[in-house]
Amino acid sequence: MMPSWKSESFSRAAGGVAVCMAVGLAVARADETAEFSGPRAFAHLQKICDLGPRPSGSAAMVTQRAMLVEYFRAAGGTVSGQAFTIRDPRTGNAVHMENLLVEWHPDRPERVLIGAHYDTRPFPDRDPVDPKGTFVGANDGASGVALLMELARGMPALATPVGVDFVLFDGEEYVFSQRDPYFLGSTYFARQYAAGQQTRPPQAVRYRYGVIVDMVADRDLGIWQEQRSVTWPDTAPVVDAIWAVAARRGVRQFVPRPKYTIDDDHVPLRMIGRIPTCDIIDFDYPHWHTTQDLPEQCAGESLEAVGGVLLEWLRGQR
């Protein structure tokens, strides 16, 4: 991120039980009354970070993708991949990327999209000491994925007429200079979705709302309302509803005022895909794009604050 459909060509993403077992990720039984567990979510974050940096096209990204495919299938989701290819902005060589779609209750045509990027920036370019060093991306990369992994426990038993899709975007920040484009995966997804909406019958899949979760594990969490999300007339009600849930739950980390204008995956989803999508993000994170974006800067309590609010909001969809 930077401050301020379902395609018919989806390919089945590769995955293996051995990969899932190797990283020690267990899937809990679905439970209609299950509450979001911060410790479980943090364990997912740690296991993802144990893979090391996960930039698009890397071996660690391929391993992570296989792990996630197996995890979400075991949790009861219908998982598919949306593959696309871009050119490396430095060399012109092909880089293969893939968004992951996890469908819950695919028979329900009215749907909500919950998205997060699962790639990491190639380098910690804001690090004052080593801007070409190792970037693990615990908060900026792993936190949104870990949140969706724990949120999956409550999805099979979701007793609403609305289905839910998790979308894990590749290529959110495959960026080597300020000239390089961001949001490659969400832009591709939005274009495919928009094209499909023009040709499909009225009863086809339609996204009622979208929510992006990004950088949601900071130990000192503060989720201010993102400026675009409260300014766009079709996304402002989504923000109001989510922050109202936070207020009812007494989750003080959700601040009911706007602060930053942030370019993130919600922008192409809304501007290209016409999906009313808001951004849930803590942009007051001192370790952003540095070598210190590590699990020790994150907390399960923060993941639980955000995940618990989202789970209750989803359960309230009618």
Locations of the language-model features?
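Structural recognition of the beta-strand scaffold that forms the well-ordered cores
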Residues: 101, 111-115, 165-168, 208-214, ...
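Second-shell loop/turn segments in exported
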Residues: 31-35, 49-62, 86-91, 130-141, ...
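Stable alpha-helical elements in mature extracytoplasmic
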Residues: 37-47, 60, 64-71, 141-147, ...
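Active-site-adjacent substrate-binding region
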Residues: 60, 81-83, 87, 209, ...
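Acidic/histidine-rich catalytic neighborhood of metal-dependent amide-processing enzymes
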Residues: 132-234, 265-266
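A non-catalytic alpha/beta surface segment that caps or lines the substrate-entry region
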Residues: 34, 43-107
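N-terminal secretory signal peptides that target proteins for export/translocation
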Residues: 1-10
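Bacterial N-terminal signal peptides
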Residues: 14-24
